[in-house]
Every structure is written in C-alpha cells, then in structure tokens.
Regions:
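Membrane-proximal, proline-rich intrinsically disordered regions
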Residues: 20-68, 243, 254
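Hydrophobic-face positions in mid-chain alpha helices that act as interaction patches
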Residues: 39-44, 60, 73, 80-84, ...
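Conserved, well-structured interaction surfaces
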Residues: 82-157, 188, 203-210
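Alpha-helical solenoid repeat scaffolds, predominantly canonical TPR units
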Residues: 111, 193, 200, 207, ...
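Short coil/linker segments at helix-helix boundaries
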Residues: 125-133, 156-191, 195
Length: 261
C-alpha cells in the first residue's frame, strides 16, 4: 500500500512540474511592456484596436443600444437584465453598461497610443517601400481610430458641445504617452477634448494612407468622421466642406436612391 501511495504521489508531482511549463508562447500578441519590433506587430495592434472598437462593449452594441433604450426605441425588462436602468432612466455613473463603455473606450485609446509609438519605432528600422507604406497606412488609421473613439465617448460622457458647455467636463486626454499606474489624471474641458479630436484628425491627414477598404480607416471615411465632429461642434461651414469631400469622392460607387425604392 505504501508503494502504491509513493508511486501515486510521484505521478502527481510529475504532473505539477509539467504544468509549470505549459505556458503557450504568444504568436500574434506583443507584451505591452515591450516595444513593437516588426510590421506584423503593428498590424496586429491595429487589428486588435479595431476589434475592440467594433466589439459589443463599445460600438458593436453598447453605444448604439444606449441611445435606443434611452430614447424608448427599444424596451428592456427585468428578464433581459441589460439596459434596464437605461430604459427607465434610473442609471448612474456606476451602471454596468456605462462602466464597460468607458473602460473599453480607453482600452482602444491606449492601444492606438501604443500603436503610434510602435509604428514610428518600426518605421525607423525598415527599408522596403512596401513595409513603410504599410506602417504609413497603420499610422493614419491609429490616429483616426483614436479620434473617433474620443468623439463617441464624448457623446456618452459629456454634454452636447456649445459655447455654454465648452468650459465644462470633457474627457481624460491620453496624448503621446499612456497613463502610468497610480498616475493622477484629470478630465479636460469639453472644448479641449474637441480640439484634441480635431488635432488627431489633422495629424492623420499627414499620412498618405493607401487603404481603400471601407472596413478600415481611410482618407474618405476619415473625412466623414471630421464632418460629424464639426457638425456636433456647430461648425457648419467646416461640416459642409468635409462632407462635400466625401460626396464628391470617386472612391466609392454612388447609389441612386430611386434605384432602391
């Protein structure tokens, strides 16, 4: 019996020692504490940020659903659970859907900030025109995605832009460096938030992005983002200029509404 027990304990010990070495090496992710070293690292970071942006925590559900439930376009019940407080206007800053949107938005913002730093780091190392163009494409998309994320966050967590509300609370601005653990942060003004959004968009324009897919940030839908931002700022001249650039672009096929009726 003693021999059986000793053998059994030996097997358990072997399994435990084996389990200690079962960590799977990352193949598509980069440790956030380490700089990006390859074009693929930068591309993966962009795809990760885009996935988070389109996921249910942010634009894929929560952002759109918040407007639907608060506006009584959709109805919630105790059995569904989600968005019940939104539907009844009994939510506060601790409501789950709002917390998730805030956290997810800043995950995207941090990912874009890291991506910009990584793309510039890798750009200094590569020599081929193809790799440089890929990184240039990524840089415009990171800046554009960061701007869009701040814009949509401001729609949820800030008052509507106006001269009266401009000095009021905006968002925490993460600029060239990510916020360190335990670093004290403050919300900027609404005016500074919108100024930073436009600054990001203008910076994005400085990169000659060759991306044409409508599923990614490209020069045309970046103009559409600018048009929407300026519309919310009540800058109607700027809105018309940006919107006209989209409408008159030959990048996408125009559809006649009469053909769809």
């Amino acid at each position: 019996m003693k021999k059986i027990f000793v053998s059994f304990m030996g097997v358990i010990a072997a399994l435990l020692f084996t389990a200690c070495n079962m960590d799977v090496p990352l193949t598509h992710n980069t440790d956030g504490d380490k700089p990006m070293e390859t074009v693929q690292d930068v591309t993966n970071a962009l795809h990760g940020a885009m996935e988070q942006f389109g996921g249910y925590r942010f634009m894929g559900r929560n952002y759109v659903a918040t407007g639907d439930f608060c506006g009584d376009i959709a109805n919630a019940s105790a059995s569904t659970g989600h968005f019940l407080h939104m539907n009844g206007w009994t939510f506060d800053e601790n409501s789950g859907e709002l917390e998730v949107m805030w956290q997810s938005g800043y995950v995207i913002i941090v990912a874009c900030t890291r991506g910009i730093e990584g793309a510039n780091h890798v750009m200094a190392k590569v020599s081929s025109d193809e790799e440089k163009q890929t990184l240039t494409n990524c840089l415009q998309q990171f800046y554009g995605l960061k701007a869009a994320t701040y814009f949509y966050l401001s729609n949820i967590f800030c008052k509507a832009y106006s001269a009266e509300h401009a000095p009021g609370l905006g968002l925490v601005l993460v600029k060239d460096e990510i916020i360190k653990p335990e670093q004290k942060v403050e919300r900027s003004t609404l005016e500074d938030t919108y100024k930073y959004i436009l600054e990001l968009i203008n910076k994005a324009y400085t990169y000659d992005n060759k991306e044409t897919s409508p599923f990614f940030i490209n020069p045309i839908n970046l103009k559409a983002i600018e048009a929407k931002v300026r519309l919310y700022m009540r800058d109607y001249t700027g809105t018309l200029a940006a919107a006209d650039a989209v409408v008159t672009s030959e990048a996408y096929k125009k559809v006649d509404p009469k053909e769809q009726s």
